[in-house]
A protein has these predicted regions:
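Membrane-proximal intracellular helices of multi-pass ion channels
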Residues: 1-457
């Protein structure tokens, strides 16, 4: 009888709890597998704290590493890491239901409601078809990316280049930023057009989100004339995501070009085209990808601060990227200017922004700053690194970016444990909690407390 009651309690877990529990279970299983001697390149078990850190950074698609991925882990260990990255990028529950579909098992109404919460959709109509598109689209994009990578990595690494290409394609699309080539990420390919272009495209596609994908494809499929009006046919969500993404890439690249132009440690000796490549890549990768073509510790303080801001913003909702999200920031800014202008409603692209969306945006931004601030305070208590390096590390962890100013590998036990927490919370907390709140029924109390004016600002 007690077992039946416990099973009912598990079934009655909210979507948020199931998401958080699924990621936690994946981390624990992944850390156990990585702690086995077979996962180590030397045949000796890696310390469990490093296995736990690697499992967390993989499933949370962060990319911060305490040990070199290419030299520490065996092929089996790298396969485990790649599986965790794919699992984290798509979402544990998404993959689980994808497997059920592959086994021809029917998804019940409860399963469809959960997928609605996971993808943050308005209804469950066509949810199974949407899931199928997500899974197939992911495999197609990653496969194309791997094939393009092979044109560079196979000539350079031989047959091993095939595995490197597959690993990098999945890691880039999932915005994980982990690679198995060298300690300095993609710094050796800073001037390689194919590697730069493919990596940036995979990062952007993964970061835009699946909703934007299918909305753009829908418009392109149905449009027959007046192509200049394609943008008008997109949903408000897609318009915001595409616009903010474009602005951040262009403005970010211009800022890095300006502030790194005379930096002797980075771009001073580069040609103009090389500076453009490096600046573009930095603007794209800081939006939660984690790959690097220039050493992050060599950036000027101004560029480091710009990188922190871009990391905080991150990608778009319902994608593989982390951060506060482009749409969240856009809604918050529009709402702020509406308040300043004494406007009753926040408007964007000729549409009013729902009050609920504004409230969610405030909640997401607030939670991110709380998590990042507490992590910064705690990490500064256990390490004597520079403040800019600590802030860079904690924001990178919270926004699941993976860029570091050479601090991750020097963390002690407490430092590693501190960084593990924001990586996990950044992946499941600010996102899934807001989704859960939006699906809960409001308490409509018959008696309401009186309202009283207060002074703010």
């Amino acid at each position: 009888m007690e077992c039946v009651m416990n099973s009912k309690k598990i079934i009655q877990l909210s979507t948020t709890q199931k998401i958080m529990l699924s990621f936690l279970c994946a981390i624990l299983v992944g850390s156990f597998l990585l702690a086995l001697p077979i996962s180590s390149a030397t045949g000796e078990a890696v310390p469990y704290i490093d296995a736990l850190f690697t499992a967390t950074t993989s499933i949370c698609v962060t990319g911060l590493v305490t040990v070199p991925t290419y030299s520490t882990w065996s092929v089996w260990g790298q396969i485990v890491i790649l599986f965790l990255i794919q699992l984290g990028g798509l979402g544990v529950i998404t993959v689980m239901y994808g497997v059920m579909m592959g086994l021809h098992r029917r998804l019940g109404l409860g399963n469809r409601w959960m997928l609605q919460d996971v993808f943050n959709l308005n209804n469950i109509s066509g949810i199974v078809k949407f899931l199928r598109k997500v899974l197939i689209g992911t495999l197609v994009v990653e496969g194309c990316g791997a094939l393009l990578y092979m044109t560079v990595f196979v000539p350079g690494y031989g047959l091993r280049g095939i595995w490197i290409s597959i690993f990098n394609a999945v890691s880039a699309f999932c915005n994980a930023g982990m690679d198995i080539m060298a300690e300095d990420s993609l710094c050796g390919y800073v001037f390689q057009p194919m590697v730069n272009l493919v990596t940036m495209l995979l990062i952007i596609l993964g970061g835009l989100g699946y909703i934007v994908w299918w909305d753009v494809l829908r418009v392109l499929k149905n449009i027959r004339s007046q192509k200049l009006k394609c943008f008008r046919l997109l949903t408000l969500h897609s318009k915001i995501a595409l616009t903010v993404t474009g602005i951040l890439i262009v403005v970010g690249a211009a800022a890095f070009y300006i502030f790194e132009y005379n930096n002797p440690l980075t771009m001073q000796d580069y040609t103009v085209p090389q500076r453009i490549w490096a600046s573009l890549f930095q603007a794209v990768t800081t939006r939660t990808a984690g790959f690097a073509t220039i050493p992050q510790e060599d950036l000027t303080n101004t560029s480091a601060i710009i990188s922190v801001l871009l990391m905080l913003i991150g990608g778009s909702p319902v994608g593989t990227a982390g951060g506060m999200k482009t749409v969240t920031i856009a809604v918050l800014l529009v709402s702020m200017f509406a308040t300043i202008g004494n406007k009753e409603d926040a408007e964007l692209f000729g549409r009013n922004i729902p009050k609920q969306a504004v409230n969610k945006s405030v909640a997401v931004v607030g939670m991110f700053f709380i998590i990042a601030s507490l992590s910064t305070i705690l990490l500064s208590a256990v390490t004597d690194a520079d403040v800019i390096d600590i802030v860079y590390e904690t924001v990178s962890a919270t926004a699941t970016v993976g860029l570091s100013r050479n601090l991750t590998s020097m963390l002690n036990l407490w430092g590693k444990l501190i960084i593990i927490v924001p990586m996990y919370l950044g992946r499941v907390g600010p996102i899934s909690l807001v989704v859960a709140f939006s699906t809960q029924k409001k308490n409509k109390n018959i008696v309401k407390n009186p309202t009283e004016e207060i002074s703010v600002g």
